[in-house]
Structure formats: C-alpha cells, structure tokens
C-alpha cells in the first residue's frame, strides 16, 4: 500500500465511468489539480461516436466553473493542453458488453494500459424504468467488472454504490456485502436472472403501446419488484443487485465498494459550494426558498445523512490507495455523517429558514419572496389528511363546478389535479429518506481515516474526509445554500 495519495496517482492510467456526472467531474478535477503527472484518464461518456464524446467533454467538463481554480492556476491554454494530453474521451455505454466500445484496437489498448477502474456510472432516479435501472445499475456493474478483469495491469476496481441499499431498516447499518439472492423482505428469494427475464417479458407485452405508456408501466413495474423484495424503490434495488453480481463474480480482482449517503456541494475543494443539479435535500431547500413549501413530510428528529462531494472523492482516492493490488480483497466503506456528526431534519429546517429570512430569493416581479417556516408532519397519515383538507376537498368542489359549468374552471381543475398527483408521488418517493431511522456505521471508513493519519504526508488536508470536521450550521448557511443559488438557480 502506498501511503501518499498524490504519489499513488502518479503515472497511473485510470478508467472513469459516469462522466459527465457530478461526482465523476469532481474526481477528474481533483486528479488533474493535485497530480498532473497522472499518465492517462480514459473518460467513458455516453455518446454515439468520438466526435460527440469530445464535444461532451468540452461543453460539460472542460468549460464549467468547477475547473476555474485550475484555469486560474494554469491559464486557459495550458489547462486545455493538459486535458488534451491526459484525458481520452471514450464513447461508450456500460449497459452493453465491453462498455459499448466499438473500436477493437482501442479496447485492446485499454486492456493493456489501465491500472485502476472507477465505476461511478449509474441512473439515480428513484422510480427509473426497470429495464433502464437493470441495464445500468445491475448488469452495467457486471459489465464494468468483466471489463476490469481483462485489464492485464488492473490493480483495483472501485465501484460507487449508495448507502441506501440498506432499504428502510432502522438502527446501526453495517458495512457488509450483500450475498447473492439476499433480500430485505426476509421471506422471499431473489433470482437476478428471473428479474431480467420478467423485465424482458413485460417489455414484450408492451410492444404495441405508446412510448409514454411503456415508460410509465416500466417505472411502476420496477417499483413493484423493488417493494416485493423489501427495497423502497427501483434505484436502490437495482444498485443492490449490482453489488451482488460484482461480489459473486469478482474472482481475485481487488474490489472496493464506496457507499456514500446524500451527496451535497463541495465543502473545500476545488472551492466551497460547487454543485450541479438538484439533489434530494436541494429540492426541499429550493421549494422552501420560493415560498412553495407550506407543509412537508419529515421527522424533525430523523438524521439526514449528508456528505460533501469532495469528501466522497477524497475517501475514494484514499481507499484506492490503501487497497490497490490487494488480491482477492472486497472492502466496503460507508461515506457519510450520521454516525460521527449527525444533523437532523429539524436543524436543517432551522438553518434554511434563517437563511431565507435574511437573504430571500427574488421573485419574477422583482420583489423578495417572503417565506414562512411551514408545518412539518411526521407521518404519512398526517400528511395525507392535510392534503385532503387543504387541496383534495377543494379539488372535488372544483370538479363538481366543472361538471355543471364545463366552460368555466376546466383548466384550473386539470392543473390543480396534476399538481396534487405530482406532489403525492414525490412524497411517496422521498418518504423512505424523510422518515429514515437508520444510522450508517462507518467503522471501516474510520479505520481508513486512522491509517491515513498514521501515514499522513498530505499535511495540507487535501484528502480530508472526516465528517467531524463539518460545522453544519456554517456549511449549510454559508456554503451549500449560496452554492445552490449560484450554480443551480443561477441567481
């Protein structure tokens, strides 16, 4: 094991999937900034050809704000030269054998050159179509494993999963692997091949349906299969099956599985507050800031397990450094905060309310949006009752008026009905996390932190991933929400 992460990355050829996703970009920036002597980074991008892959690299990676520190340090021309020298954009798709690569010479070259494989590719939609979820999160993970096993210099496969494959279990949740066929329902057996066959059969039944009907039916089918086996949604179910396949078929390839919790904006590197897209917590924050969150389903005492993106990347690099070349190893790391530095939804609610009271968003009319703290309801029954009294009864009255006077309120009825259905569906999707009662044990991750401290050479804290260092009030109010407003809302 090499004790120094920067030295470890030097002269390595690395394959990274999942670009241009949020976490993959943070990882690429980190490597280029701290170890420009990395030999090569193969960056797998979903694209039909090399030209399209290069265009995605330029527009979705090279030109974004995340790289402004490197851009300022090196200058635009030197940064572009570094990226051209070190990054090889590869058009591909992990849901296809050999990662969807078509150039046989390129495949052979990659198999002969690659030292480390980092799989971040995933679909994270909770209610993803079952065929897509299986293709990417389950069998895509197996395709990456099979590709990695053919890399003659392959020292390690690092796979990014999610801590929430634990389902809705309460208590202390351990860093342990899933056994093939294990379920969370307890009284059922899971056969991944049967799940694949059922998915294919369902698609065959839908071949004469519209695209919209196929999409919705496959989403509902995935949710039904997940709940049958004890998982709350298609995302975590398909990720769990992906872990099972990797564990069973890894042979002697060193396998590290990183299970992050809810990933948030960067806390330190390359600069505080960078984020892309609305994550789980962010949808709540934005709705609150826009004055749309009058009532919300959550347990004020439940721990919301958050972890900044740069800490996840630091843990990934530290784990890769620790286990590279450890033949036969399968190591699992929870990367989160609930065990060492928990923050509750009630605290997050207070931080958010205080922020927008002092610094309100500006509405379309140019005036500050005045927000009220709103009501938190801690059970689905309470929330359903609230929705019935506040919205559904008025909707029924509007429906009756629409029947009697069909020309008067038809648009209002349809619009309100659609919004209520969407709100209830979102609440049902997020409910397992808003009322979550589990705490993610991070004993393995703590041992990794201790090992790094014993051998520490990165004295500047450039590979910090200890959640105890986070001041949640300061981070949420001075880093995360401002970053969200700047980089996502563009205000």
UniProtKB/Swiss-Prot annotation:
GO cellular component assignments: chloroplast; plasma membrane
Tissue: Expressed in the endodermal cell layer surrounding the central vasculature in roots. Expressed in the hilum region of seeds. Expressed in lateral root tips, cotyledons, the shoot apex, young leaves, petals, stamen filaments, and receptacle of siliques.
GO biological process: lipid metabolic process; response to salt stress; response to wounding; suberin biosynthetic process
Pfam families, A to Z: NAD_binding_4, Sterile
Protein EC: 1.2.1.84
Keywords: Lipid biosynthesis, Lipid metabolism, NADP, Oxidoreductase
Reactions accelerated catalytically: a long-chain fatty acyl-CoA + 2 NADPH + 2 H(+) = a long-chain primary fatty alcohol + 2 NADP(+) + CoA
GO MF annotation terms: alcohol-forming long-chain fatty acyl-CoA reductase activity; alcohol-forming very long-chain fatty acyl-CoA reductase activity; long-chain-fatty-acyl-CoA reductase activity
UniProt induction comment: Induced by wounding and salt stress.
Signal sequence residues: none
PANTHER family xref list: FATTY ACYL-COA REDUCTASE 1, MALE STERILITY PROTEIN 2-RELATED
Function (record text): Catalyzes the reduction of fatty acyl-CoA to fatty alcohols. Catalyzes specifically the formation of C18:0 and C22:0 fatty alcohols. Provides the fatty alcohols required for synthesis of suberin in roots, seed coat and wound-induced leaf tissue. Provides the fatty alcohols required for synthesis of alkyl hydroxycinnamates in root waxes.
Family recorded in the similarity comment: Belongs to the fatty acyl-CoA reductase family.
Name under which the protein is recorded: Fatty acyl-CoA reductase 1
Organism this protein belongs to: Arabidopsis thaliana
């Amino acid at each position: 094991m090499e004790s120094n992460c920067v030295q470890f990355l030097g002269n390595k050829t690395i394959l990274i999937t999942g670009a241009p996703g949020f976490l993959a970009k943070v990882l690429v920036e980190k490597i280029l900034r701290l170890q420009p002597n990395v030999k090569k980074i193969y960056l797998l991008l979903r694209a039909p050809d090399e030209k399209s892959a290069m265009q995605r690299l330029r527009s979705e990676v090279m030109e974004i704000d995340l790289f402004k520190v490197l851009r300022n340090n090196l200058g635009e021309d030197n940064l572009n030269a570094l990226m051209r020298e070190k990054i090889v954009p590869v058009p591909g798709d992990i849901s296809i054998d050999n990662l969807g690569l078509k150039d046989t010479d390129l495949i052979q070259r990659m198999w002969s050159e690659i030292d480390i494989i980092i799989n971040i590719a995933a679909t994270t939609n909770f209610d993803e179509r079952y065929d897509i979820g299986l293709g990417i999160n389950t069998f895509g993970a197996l395709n990456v494993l099979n590709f990695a096993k053919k890399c003659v210099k392959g020292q390690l496969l690092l796979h990014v999963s999610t801590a929430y494959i634990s389902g809705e279990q309460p208590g202390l949740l351990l860093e342990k692997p899933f056994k093939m066929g294990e379920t969370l329902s307890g009284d059922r057996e899971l056969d991944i091949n049967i799940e694949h066959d059922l998915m294919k059969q369902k698609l065959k039944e839908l071949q004469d349906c519209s695209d919209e009907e196929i999409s919705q039916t496959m989403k509902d089918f995935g949710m039904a299969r997940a709940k049958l086996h004890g998982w709350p949604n298609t995302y975590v179910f398909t990720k769990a099956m992906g872990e099972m396949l990797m564990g069973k078929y890894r042979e002697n390839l060193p396998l590290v599985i990183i299970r992050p919790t809810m990933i948030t904006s960067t806390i330190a590197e390359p600069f505080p507050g960078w984020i892309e897209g609305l994550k789980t917590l962010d949808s709540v924050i934005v709705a609150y800031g826009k004055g749309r969150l009058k009532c919300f389903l959550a347990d004020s005492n439940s721990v919301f397990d958050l972890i900044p993106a740069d800490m996840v990347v630091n843990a990934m690099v530290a784990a890769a450094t620790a286990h590279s070349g450890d033949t036969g190893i399968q190591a699992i790391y929870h990367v989160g905060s609930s065990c060492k530095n928990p923050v509750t939804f009630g605290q997050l609610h207070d931080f958010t309310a205080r922020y927008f009271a002092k610094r309100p968003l500006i509405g379309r009319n140019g005036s500050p949006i005045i927000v009220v703290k709103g009501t938190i309801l801690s059970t689905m029954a309470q929330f359903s009752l609230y929705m019935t009294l506040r919205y559904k009864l008025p909707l029924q009255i509007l429906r009756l008026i629409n029947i009697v006077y069909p020309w008067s309120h038809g648009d209002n009825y349809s619009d309100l009905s659609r919004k209520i259905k969407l709100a209830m569906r979102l609440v049902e999707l997020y409910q397992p996390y808003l009322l979550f009662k589990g705490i993610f044990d991070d004993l393995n991750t703590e041992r990794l932190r201790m090992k790094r401290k014993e051998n520490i050479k990165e004295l500047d804290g450039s590979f910090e991933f200890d959640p105890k260092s986070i001041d949640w009030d300061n981070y949420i109010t001075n880093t995360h929400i401002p970053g969200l407003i700047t980089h996502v809302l563009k205000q």
